[in-house]
Amino acid sequence: MTWPDRDTSAFPSALPGAFDASSAMSRGVVNLSSFSDFLRTQAPHLLPVSGSPGVTPSDAVPHGTTIVALKFPGGVVMAGDRRATQGHMIASRDVQKVYITDDYTVTGIAGTAAIAVEFARLYAVELEHYEKLEGVALTFPGKVNRLATMVRGNLGAALQGFVALPLLAGYDLDDPNPEGAGRIVSFDAAGGHNLEEEGYQSVGSGSIFAKSSMKKLYSQVTDADSALRVAIEALYDAADDDSATGGPDLVRGIFPTAVVITADGAVEIAEQQIADMCREIIQNRSRADTFGPDHAPVRGDEL
């Protein structure tokens, strides 16, 4: 028997609030073959992870801080500490955060370590690739725009908490004034960039303390050596107040890394030079009523 004129209204629709499988599938809301997906859309409180505190990105992956950069007559210097943190734990004490990306640019990384390191490495390959194809190197504004595009491409991850912000420093060969050719560029998570005009910049969790230090000491910058010293002083001040920034580690022999860029190109500063400067800074900052790092041991009868 057939029912050609069957009245579909005789079959009542689903009650208000009831789960409509066909409608859900048509909207791509739920996978009916997965019971967990069904629970996720209809009763998320029944899932085992429901109501439990989530793990923030800063607790799940290592983060690196802090980077400083200063301009001096004829060039620019960039330095970075060596600590990486994972939540409240120290993930690493000897992270490399300052990378030479070509003959006249250097990139410092802060934020999610894995993403930031890939930024620096990929950026170096991008600059080399362009030069091989075009036969000429990118201009400094072109280098800035290329790095900004890479940062903007990470916006989706940044919105989820995996932020990685580079700090770019370089020497602009097209500047007619060699004494003022040093450049420092900072970036935001959306790919916006700012050419620093004050002469110094810092990124990372300790940046507020590092910038305050550089603001007070920048008048002492006259050449590459004095700029390097101010950079190390700024990192020391940042480590003094920010637990995520690592200061000079005399016990393990771990010190900040630094790169100087002039018209002759980018040069990584020798570790021994930085170590000697760190020891001198610590000695000068030691209080008169305490024992300095190189103070002779005190005998019991001298107490």
UniProtKB/Swiss-Prot annotation:
Catalytic residues in the record: 65
Pathway the protein acts in: Protein degradation; proteasomal Pup-dependent pathway
GO cellular component, one term: proteasome core complex, beta-subunit complex
InterPro entries, per the entry: Ntn_hydrolases_N, Proteasome_sua/b, Proteasome_suB-type, PSB_actinobac
Cytoplasm keyword on record: yes
Chief localisation class: cytoplasm
Reaction(s) catalysed by this chain's protein: Cleavage of peptide bonds with very broad specificity
Residues cleaved off as propeptide: 1-64
An individual GO BP term: proteasomal protein catabolic process
Summary of activators and inhibitors of this protein: The formation of the proteasomal ATPase ARC-20S proteasome complex, likely via the docking of the C-termini of ARC into the intersubunit pockets in the alpha-rings, may trigger opening of the gate for substrate entry. Interconversion between the open-gate and close-gate conformations leads to a dynamic regulation of the 20S proteasome proteolysis activity.
Domain of life: Bacteria
EC number: 3.4.25.1
Principal EC category: hydrolase
Alphabetical UniProt keywords: Autocatalytic cleavage, Cytoplasm, Hydrolase, Protease, Proteasome, Threonine protease, Zymogen
Family: Belongs to the peptidase T1B family.
Function: Component of the proteasome core, a large protease complex with broad specificity involved in protein degradation.
Quaternary structure and interacting proteins, as annotated: The 20S proteasome core is composed of 14 alpha and 14 beta subunits that assemble into four stacked heptameric rings, resulting in a barrel-shaped structure. The two inner rings, each composed of seven catalytic beta subunits, are sandwiched by two outer rings, each composed of seven alpha subunits. The catalytic chamber with the active sites is on the inside of the barrel. Has a gated structure, the ends of the cylinder being occluded by the N-termini of the alpha-subunits. Is capped by the proteasome-associated ATPase, ARC.
Record-given protein name: Proteasome subunit beta
Origin species: Mycolicibacterium gilvum (strain PYR-GCK) (Mycobacterium gilvum (strain PYR-GCK))
